């Protein structure tokens, strides 16, 4: 590392920092629509969720990888062409995790044909988690806004019985996300159809924000046209 060359002053505002987001919620709450309003974005559609943005006025560029190898090629292209986009969205990291575990299973089957190809072992999950963490770190290091979309899962504390919502990934990957993301948002829809962003943790929900001053809950109303990440980015930048 060239210390003199790499040393710099603290960024003056949020937009210069190009933070990393993890955004999670139940199926159908609008994660893809919400983040598709990110500035000059590339949507990496690993799950086939892009149809939801057809009714919106925005038009991110779209790539449809089928496996980790494709995702690696996309990363290398972005690294060499970081001036092409201001934002990259992986939809979803939960699906990428499935790819990683399946790849670990198939490699194990090649080594041992007697292994059940439909049964993931502890080793498969461990290797898959390591791969996903590596992929997430690579994209996090790009000079652009990075958004990891995830489904939600509930975890029960065996000692207290308490249930807490968080992103649907393995605990090892969740630990990575906690460490290197700047912002974790939870999207929910209440009984009236209001879409809300949880920005801070409580006893039942995992969330955080390291940058800017935000309310614990951002209410973006019932209209999809108002449910957009650029509104929240502006809130953070002006806080």
PLM region descriptions:
Residues 2-99:
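Conserved P-loop
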